[in-house]
Structures are given as C-alpha cells and as structure tokens.
C-alpha cells in the first residue's frame, strides 16, 4: 500500500514538474518574441484588414482564410523580428531593468537558437503572407528589414534619430492588413501608416524619459540622454501636433469618428503642452506614455466601430 502511494506521489510530482516546465518555457518564449508587441501590432493589422474589407465592399465572413493567413503571417514575422532583435541586443539588455531578465541575457536560452528561431518564424510568416498577396509579403519583409537592420543594427546604437527609424517598422502592420485584402494603392492605408509613424516617437520618447538612466548605462543615444528633457518635450509636442489633421482624411468613417479622433489628438497635445510648465518631468513622461497607449487602442477600436453604423 505504501509503495502504491509512493508511485502516485512520484507521478504527481512528475506532472507538477512538467507543468512548471511548460510554463517556464512559454514564459521564456513570450519574452524572446516580445508577445506584448506582437499582440498590440496584431490589433493594428486587424484594423487595417477590417477597413480594407469595408472600403472595398468585400465581406469579412467570406474571407476568413485571408483573415487567418494575414494574422498568422504578420504575427510570426513580428515575433521573428523581435527574436532577432533580442539576439542582437543581448549585450546591452543586461544594463536595463526591463530587459535584464530576458533569456538571452540570463543564459536560459542559447542565443544562437534564438537567432535561428527568429529567422524561422520570419520565413514561415512570410509564407503565410504570400497566401494572401505578394504585396502584403513584401510590406512585411520591409518592416522586418527596417526593424532588424536599419533600427537594431545601425541607428539604435549610434543616432538619436533611432526612434524615428524604428517608427517605420512599427507603422507597417496596418498596411500589411490592408494589402492582404487589396494590394492596390489607397489613401486609407497611407493614413494608417502615417498615424502609426507619428504616434511612435512621442510614445517611445516618453518611455525614454522614464528610463533615461538605464539607456545612458546601456550606451544607447536616446534623445533625452543626449540632448536632455527640454528638447525631448518640444519634439514630443511637435510629433503629437502632426497627428491633428490625419483623422480628417478618414472623413468617410463619419462625424462621430472624427470627433473621437480629434478629441484624442487635442487631449494629447494639451497634455504635452502642460509638460512645458511641469517641474516633475518623469511624472509628466509617465502620463504621456499611459495616454499614448490608451490613444492608440481607442483610436483603432473607434475606426472599427465606425464601420458598423
């Protein structure tokens, strides 16, 4: 009887260890591919695809295969690009609080395996996008190349303009979504690209202000590290102001959308201007960062809702 209990206990312990192991592996993989970035970019990818269905008159439910291959392909290309970024940045990630626990830094994952994982994910993702349109696959490849080569390998470590260069790749997902449905040129994906492109500098510069000393320790020439908070604030305000006219190019989504989008833009701009008088720069940067996250979510959800009226 005692032996039987021991067997059951051993089995239970083995099951528990297996469960813990699976959770640990998933946690490490999620960190390597930056699952949060993947998820947020899939929201904009879906929005671009949804708007393409709306403006071209195609039916969503009749094109579920496109939806699947677009989201599948985009997710893997983004995840793979992030994994390659983790491989490249493993030498500087150790100096930053938010990145020092990544598997490529702690050694819990072989960096070479992370690199090959990234390359494999990008390759499979590109094949997925090719199941939609060649244009979508090309756009995805441009986004990956910009993020890995122009941003991670080149500008991130050498120039304060790194944030702007990185914004190109971050603005690609909604264009992937659109071109997967309609590869022809249209003003809407261009506006979606510009919204995402202009949104990213104030978002990431606010983050850079919050993490200024970490970036300094890592030797990354972010704008607040090189030129200080005053110039960073002014640039953030300029980037936010550039967003103001863009919603009006989407006037066909209706007046309610224009009102929501304009209120979001004006609110962000007013918060930015308030920073010129605030003495607590870090507190202001936190407010700007949180606002930017809510801004993007509300704006793209509003776009989708506007098509349902």
UniProtKB/Swiss-Prot annotation:
Segments passing through the bilayer: 35-55, 64-84, 114-134, 135-155, 161-181, 187-207, 231-251, 253-273, 289-309
GO cellular component: plasma membrane
Record's keyword annotation contains Membrane: yes
Predominant subcellular localization, coarse grouping: membrane
Catalytic activity: heme b + (2E,6E)-farnesyl diphosphate + H2O = Fe(II)-heme o + diphosphate
Compartments where found: Cell membrane
Entry's Gene Ontology molecular function annotations: protoheme IX farnesyltransferase activity
GO biological process, one term: heme O biosynthetic process
Keywords attached to this entry: Cell membrane, Heme biosynthesis, Membrane, Transferase, Transmembrane, Transmembrane helix
Keyword Kinase listed: no
Membrane topology: Multi-pass membrane protein
PROSITE patterns xref list: UBIA
Pathway(s) it belongs to: Porphyrin-containing compound metabolism; heme O biosynthesis; heme O from protoheme: step 1/1
The protein's Enzyme Commission number: 2.5.1.141
Functional note: Converts heme B (protoheme IX) to heme O by substitution of the vinyl group on carbon 2 of heme B porphyrin ring with a hydroxyethyl farnesyl side group.
Further details from the record: Carbon 2 of the heme B porphyrin ring is defined according to the Fischer nomenclature.
Family, per entry: Belongs to the UbiA prenyltransferase family. Protoheme IX farnesyltransferase subfamily.
Matches recorded under NCBIfam families: cyoE_ctaB
Quaternary structure and partners: Interacts with CtaA.
Protein name: Protoheme IX farnesyltransferase
Organism this protein belongs to: Geobacillus kaustophilus (strain HTA426)
């Amino acid at each position: 009887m005692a032996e039987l209990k021991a067997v059951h206990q051993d089995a239970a312990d083995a099951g528990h260890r297996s469960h813990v192991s699976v959770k640990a592996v998933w946690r490490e993989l999620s960190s390597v591919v930056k699952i949060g970035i993947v998820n947020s970019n899939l929201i904009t990818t879906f929005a671009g695809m949804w708007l393409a269905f709306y403006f071209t008159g195609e039916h969503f439910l009749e094109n579920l295969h496109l939806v699947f291959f677009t989201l599948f392909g985009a997710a893997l290309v983004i995840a793979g690009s992030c994994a390659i970024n983790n491989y490249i940045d493993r030498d500087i990630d150790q100096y930053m609080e938010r990145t020092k626990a990544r598997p490529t830094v702690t050694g819990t994952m072989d960096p070479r395996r992370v690199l090959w994982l990234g390359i494999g994910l990008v390759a499979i993702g590109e094949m997925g996008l090719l199941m939609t349109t060649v244009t979508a696959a090309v756009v995805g490849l441009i986004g990956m190349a910009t993020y890995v080569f122009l941003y991670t390998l080149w500008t991130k470590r050498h120039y304060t303009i790194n944030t702007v260069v990185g914004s190109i790749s971050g603005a690609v997902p909604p264009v992937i979504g659109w071109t997967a449905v309609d590869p022809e040129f249209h003003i809407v994906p261009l506006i979606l690209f510009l919204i995402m492109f202009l949104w990213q500098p104030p978002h990431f510069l606010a983050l850079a202000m919050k993490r200024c000393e970490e970036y300094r320790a890592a030797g990354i020439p972010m704008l607040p590290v090189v030129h200080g908070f005053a110039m960073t604030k002014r640039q953030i305000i300029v980037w936010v102001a550039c967003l103001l006219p863009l919603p009006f190019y989407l006037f066909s989504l209706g007046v309610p959308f224009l009102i929501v989008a304009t209120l979001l833009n004006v609110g962000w701009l007013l918060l930015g201007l308030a920073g010129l008088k605030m003495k607590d720069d870090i507190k202001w940067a936190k407010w700007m960062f949180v606002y930017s996250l809510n801004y993007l979510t509300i704006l793209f959800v509003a776009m989708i809702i506007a098509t349902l009226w």
